[in-house]
Curated annotation (Swiss-Prot):
Protein name (Swiss-Prot/TrEMBL): Bifunctional lycopene cyclase/phytoene synthase
One GO BP: carotenoid biosynthetic process
GO molecular function: geranylgeranyl diphosphate synthase activity; intramolecular lyase activity; lycopene beta cyclase activity
Family: In the N-terminal section; belongs to the lycopene beta-cyclase family.
Taxonomic source organism: Aspergillus oryzae (strain ATCC 42149 / RIB 40)
Tree of life domain: Eukaryota
Region of interest (Phytoene synthase), ranges: 243-587
Length: 587
């Protein structure tokens, strides 16, 4: 009886599990626990018979003073725990690295050729393993590894090869490589200390470095591949269920249970719409490139709700860019009117869009990206009046160029109204989606509570817009726009014309601080109501708001973009910490 193997866990495996859990805990969902539990159960069921054979036939042996003596089918309890902790740690590494991925955008990849080639290679490897077992002796352990793990990899590849190929390679490679390197190190130390041994008559006798047999190198590599591919298969099933639900025209969207998702994956004939997947991919790329706060905020959400949000955010981004980048006032006005008409058509005849009645008679065709963005909107789960608010905000923007020298923001009330139209529309639309995706939550059921929370959400939206104005004083001045209330400017001895002439005037810092004060006040006044949102929404919503508030804090510290044309962007580490803090506070 000894504690050597236990000390390996206490020294290496358990601390790593603790660190990974601490890192991912704020973002952990019930679905994540279910995925990990599934892999742990499969690993135990698949490994115990195999490992029991290895121990009973003395392919693996343990020092008598290295284990405590408790066994399961002759397997030391420490070894059984190892299967659990390896699966847990590798799963967490995968979850951390792939949290930001929008899984449905990787659907639809046809990989028949790659599937056939991969399956052929795996069948060949299994055949080699069987031949090695027939030879026995020094080929025994090598053959046992290949013939045991090969069929699992073959099944995973046949079911999910297209999805595996479509996923980002870096995340998959790192998810496999990091745990493997760690376990190679732990295994080398343990073998050199004599905690366990691969017996000489059953191994090839080739060591890649001192104490590390080539079979052990292969074992840890192939088991981590099996774990990661197992998680990918589950994510494939979840992505299919998510895509099917998002494409449904039904207003109420309840995500099916975990086991139902897996069952439908095996039996369902659903094929994702390639056009929808392509539109989703473009929406994700657009947000990642032009709206980091919204993109990172969306990564905190999960499932169909996240997809609806991305499509909504993408529409706002497309419309805003088209208006801002118009060549002249008339072009911008045309874009706004086209957007208004297309929204009316989409909400009136979603099944006919974009060939709705009246659309084909338009004299000037709308930009294809605007049509695509509106066509992707989940209109059965949105309200037209919320999106119309954005249109009103665009019309306000036009007054700058329609009347040179005209500055529509005279008082704080004017800015409040504009912020309500532009940003509160986003918040109200988002909270409207919550009703459809969480129909059994008190927020959806209690109308009076919902009205209270939506009011608070709209104030949160105004918070974001105030910070945008404070951040973009110079950028707006470059296109002859001043969103600062004239009454505020006069108190500093300035006018809108002075802002256009010198957007870096030191006196504007007091106006900027006032904008940030207003943003912080609006945020503080609305934060308490956010606790009535579903847990799945509350943390991510606050994480998005807090990322904007952090931009405000950076502005107060004097942080500025490198050039006047750029937006102030927070370092990645800061954005991750803000998201972590907000999600941890929710937990």
């Amino acid at each position: 009886m000894g504690l050597d193997y236990i000390l390996v866990h206490v020294t290496y495996n358990i601390p790593l599990a603790g660190i990974l859990t601490l890192v991912y805990w704020p973002f952990m969902t019930r679905l994540d626990w279910q995925k990990i539990s599934t892999l742990v159960i499969i690993s135990l069921v698949a490994t115990i018979p195999w490992d029991s054979y290895l121990v009973r036939h003395r392919i693996w042996t343990y020092a008598p003073n290295g284990v405590i003596g408790w066994t399961l089918y002759d397997i030391p309890s420490e070894e059984v725990f190892f299967f659990i902790i390896q699966t847990y740690n590798t799963s967490l590494v995968y979850l951390i690295l792939t949290r930001w991925l929008v899984l449905p955008m990787y659907l639809g990849t046809v990989a028949r050729k790659e599937t056939l080639i991969g399956a052929s290679i795996l069948l060949l490897a299994i055949s080699v393993g069987l031949i090695a077992l027939c030879f026995g002796d020094h080929f025994t352990y090598f053959g046992m590894i290949i013939t045991w793990a090969g069929p699992f990899l073959l099944i995973q590849w046949v079911f999910s090869s297209g999805f595996i190929i479509a996923l980002p390679k870096l995340e998959l490679m790192v998810s496999i490589t990091l745990p493997t390197l760690f376990l190679w190190t732990v295994d080398t130390i343990s073998i050199n200390q004599g905690t366990w041994t691969v017996e000489a008559p059953t191994k090839l006798g080739v060591q890649l470095w001192s104490g590390m047999d080539i079979e052990e190198v292969l074992f840890f590599l192939i088991t981590n591949i099996v774990i990661v591919f197992g998680l990918v298969c589950i994510d494939y099933a979840i992505a299919m269920a998510t895509c099917e639900l998002v494409q449904s025209p039904q207003a109420v969207q309840s995500f099916p249970s975990y086991f139902r998702v897996l069952a439908r994956f095996v039996t369902n004939k659903y094929h994702p719409d390639k056009q929808f997947v392509a539109s989703l991919r473009k929406a994700v790329d657009r947000l990642a490139a032009s709206s980091q706060s919204m993109y990172m905020g969306s990564a905190m959400f999960q499932g169909p709700f996240r997809i609806d949000l991305i499509l909504l955010y993408s529409f706002f981004r497309v419309a805003d860019d088209l208006v801002d980048e118009s060549q002249d006032t008339e072009s911008a006005r045309m874009i706004i009117e086209q957007c208004d008409q297309l929204l009316e058509a989409k909400f009136s005849h979603p099944e006919l869009f974009p060939f709705s009645p009246g659309y084909q008679e338009a004299k000037h065709p709308a930009p294809p990206e605007l049509i695509a963005a509106i066509d992707s909107l989940p209109v059965s789960r949105l309200r037209l009046e919320h999106l119309k608010g954005l249109i009103e905000g665009f019309r306000t923007d036009l007054t700058f160029s329609a009347k040179p020298g005209s500055f529509p923001f005279v008082t704080e009330s004017d800015l409040d109204t504009y912020a309500y139209h532009v940003a509160s529309s986003v918040a109200a639309s988002m909270l409207g989606l919550v009703v459809h995706h969480f129909p059994d939550h008190q927020f959806a059921i209690n109308v009076f509570l919902r009205r209270r929370v939506v009011d608070a959400g709209e104030r949160m939206g105004q918070t974001l817009q105030y910070i945008n104005v404070a951040r973009d004083i110079a950028r707006d001045a470059a296109i002859n726009r001043v969103y600062l209330p004239t009454t505020w400017l006069k108190q500093q001895g300035l006018g809108p014309e002075d802002v256009l002439a010198s957007p870096t005037d030191s006196r504007l810092e007091l106006v900027r601080d006032r904008l940030l004060d207003r943003a912080e006040f609006l945020s503080a006044s609305a934060r308490e109501e956010m606790k009535f949102l579903p847990d799945e929404v509350q943390g991510p919503f606050l994480a998005t708001v807090d990322s904007y508030l952090e931009i405000g804090a950076a502005l107060r510290r004097g942080m500025r973009p490198r050039t006047l044309d750029d937006k102030l962007r927070l370092p990645l580490g800061t954005r991750l910490w803000v998201a972590y803090r907000a999600m941890a506070w929710r937990k």
